[in-house]
A protein has these predicted regions:
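N-terminal capping/lid subdomain adjacent to the active-site entrance of alpha/beta enzymes
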Residues: 2-186, 190-195, 199, 203-206, ...
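Glycine-rich beta-alpha junction loops
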Residues: 38, 49, 267, 294-296, ...
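Catalytic core of soluble alpha/beta enzymes
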Residues: 162, 167-299, 328
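Active-site pocket-lining/capping segments in soluble small-molecule metabolic enzymes
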Residues: 296-334, 347-349
Length: 371
């Protein structure tokens, strides 16, 4: 299809509460919303890089610049035959996975819409709903955490992720497991630890966690260090920040760096890479699950479509809009369709697009391209 029009919006979205992780406190998130048009039809996509280069080297300022100055000019007015064709045209740019994903994801949504298929069908998925989990950041007290966990259990969420950082670590897990002895939990360290902390992770084995997500720093030694750690502990290691691409996951499998992989569609460069990674992991008996970057309902809906692929077997980080946002820019908002479940699209592409008034109010910068 020929790309007739392209609009890129850098948007700042206020969160409903202060979200606390090992990276610090977060009161808002920033994201890239992309509108792509071909032959009178259009679709929206989303890629949500961090707004500071903490989670990754890429961040919103650089992502927007790369999209506006380098990537969008390469595809506007061009006949793009496939998602791989689009990726090939952008291959001259190293890294910048969030920027690459912004265009590739939107291409997938538009192509599905033009073909009259819900996005999950275009990707090869088949489920009409997917299981989702609940996540809790660092809380002001253990009592507050227990109250929130009980609410999530009562609401039917099948698993809970707990943020884990120095000062909110072993004693927190011990208290949670004591109160909820049989529920499925895992922890997310957000790369806050080093190999010197191996004994801490060995102590966690007794608490029967589903996994430890990204325990060690994402640096040049990351895959080797995680492989060494996995040999020394029983709890499965899950890679997040270190699983940057299909090639990174191939290396992780060869080294034995993990037993689980978290796939964030934008972090790995889009839906094509996400699909390929989950297929590769399936070949090696490694389960996958969908991670989130605090996307709006637009990105969240796309994540739900991706989660229908067969090797996404652990409930994903796909949240009802009301969890992180008082007013989600994406409409219709994401809601639970059952106990711990989100429905997938019943219309071509996805149903979500931004509210026009909120888009105008919250846009930081906008770049527009026309043939």
């Amino acid at each position: 299809m020929k790309i007739d029009a392209l609009d890129i919006y850098w948007v700042k979205l206020p969160l409903a509460f202060n979200f606390r992780t090992s990276y610090g406190d977060q009161l808002y998130t920033e994201t890239m919303l992309v509108r792509m048009e071909s032959a009178g039809q259009y679709a929206w996509g989303e890629s949500c890089p961090p707004y500071v280069p903490s989670y990754s080297a890429e961040h919103t300022t650089g992502t927007f610049h790369t999209l506006r100055a380098l990537m969008a000019p390469r595809i506007i007015g061009q006949e793009i035959a496939s998602a791989q064709d689009l990726l090939d045209r952008l291959a001259f740019i190293k890294g910048n996975q969030f920027a690459r994903a912004a265009l590739e994801i939107t291409w997938w949504v538009l192509d599905a819409k033009r073909r009259g298929l819900p996005l999950h069908r275009a990707l090869g998925g088949s489920r009409d709903r997917v299981a989702v989990g609940a996540d809790f950041g660092v809380q002001d007290s253990l009592d507050m955490l227990m109250e929130k966990i009980q609410g999530a259990v009562d609401a039917g969420f099948p698993r809970i992720k707990l943020k884990f950082r120095p000062g909110w670590d072993l004693s927190m897990v011990e208290a949670v497991r004591s109160t909820f002895p049989d529920f499925t939990f895992h922890i997310d360290c957000n790369a806050a630890y080093t190999p010197a902390d191996t004994e801490l992770f060995r102590k966690l084995d007794r608490y029967r966690l589903a996994m430890i997500e990204q325990p060690l720093a994402d640096d040049v030694m990351s895959l080797i260090n995680h492989a060494d750690l996995q040999k020394r502990i029983e709890t499965p290691v899950c890679l997040d920040e270190s699983a940057l691409s299909l090639a990174h996951v191939q290396a992780a499998i060869r080294l034995g760096s993990c037993k689980v992989v978290n796939i964030k569609m934008a972090r790995v460069g889009g839906l094509t890479a996400s699909r390929d990674i989950q297929a590769l992991c399936a070949e090696h008996g490694i389960p996958c699950w969908i991670g989130g970057m605090l996307e709006s309902a637009i990105g969240g809906a796309i994540c739900a479509e991706l989660a229908t692929l067969p090797n996404f077997t652990y409930p994903g980080d796909i949240f009802p809009s009301s969890y992180f946002y008082k007013n989600d820019i994406g409409k219709p908002e994401i809601v639970l369709s059952g106990r711990g479940e989100v429905a997938t699209s019943r219309v071509p592409g996805i149903a979500q697009e931004p509210d026009a008034d909120l888009l105008k109010q919250w846009t930081v910068e906008h770049a527009s391209f026309r043939v």
